[in-house]
């Protein structure tokens, strides 16, 4: 039987994406030709707008868009190719690569599941305590391995805890526990440089070390976690008085598992103590990255994980996105675009209270991340606002860190963050339930982040 050809939704979307790319190219050409500013500023503004549109619409994959940054910089004569690609070898990329390698080794040897399971037994079958411990270990593990991997690992444990409850009668409890897993993973990732890509982007931009980030990252987690969980509790009103059975997790301590644990603990201790260690040896540049690279070599050489395991567990696209964001920052500075934007934004916001500026920025980042990759948001906004911060009377470090943390605080939509998407994909959460709880957290966290930036920003 003959059927007429009807464009599928993906085909129509492909047409829309192609149209966006074509219009974006035309806009870039128009800006280069007709903007009335200095030619170099025109180039900087053109590249910024061109890349921003592609990142925000995802008309091209965000990684491909990141690779367009050095390409445009070279073609338009801002940098030569060597200079354009310099930031793709930034030490922060290798630091984050070390985090991927550690996660690969823990997963390969089953130690991630073991640690989670053992902590759960401390609850002694009480659902309330079990949930608190579950959220705590989720946040703690998310500091060291990706929040995506952490959520994927902890979700089965959470579902197992709820297995004996009636999902209809105990709907609020299901929503509280499962959303709590996703939100704990996102919040926990704020704590360290390797916890979430936006952290590394801000750190690379501002030259923040591993220990320096933890000095405020961990306290922020300690503040946001109880606030977030308490607010989620008030919104959902779960019943946590049940008793549950938790399956025992046993593991044979083979040589490989012992070596994996030793590498993990050694790396964490060295990262935490990197500043005093560096000072003791007269100042070792980029010690955090050296530690990460040592961990990668130790993991593969000791055969606790193969190179293929590390390779498959590494999100190379995220690393390329780092490079694109850092190169964009260099372009804005070299072309004078940052100074140009600073003078104009400062004129517009010259009479605005600093807290209002921080509040507006936090709200913009949080709600933008609901629709755009948090990594892409940070890669775009950190270079832009770091360049205009001083003109607005705000420390560039404070503004960059606020953007990075805000990019991890989008809780309303499944597409906002990988943890949200994983929990939603389990089939146990409806989107309207996530939107109701997430909206409350978004609003409260926006205010909290602005307050923290305003009152505690001096420690940065």
Which residues does each predicted region cover?
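Hydrophobic transmembrane alpha-helices of multi-pass small-molecule transporters
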Residues: 1-95, 212-343, 441-442, 446, ...
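Membrane-embedded alpha-helical segments and adjacent helix-loop junctions characteristic
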Residues: 9, 13, 50, 64, ...
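Alpha-helical transmembrane segments
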Residues: 91-101, 143-150, 213-228, 399-408
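Membrane-water interface of transmembrane alpha-helices
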Residues: 105-109, 153-158, 230-240, 415-416
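Helix-coil boundary and interhelical linker segments in multi-pass alpha-helical membrane proteins
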Residues: 206-212, 386-397, 458-460
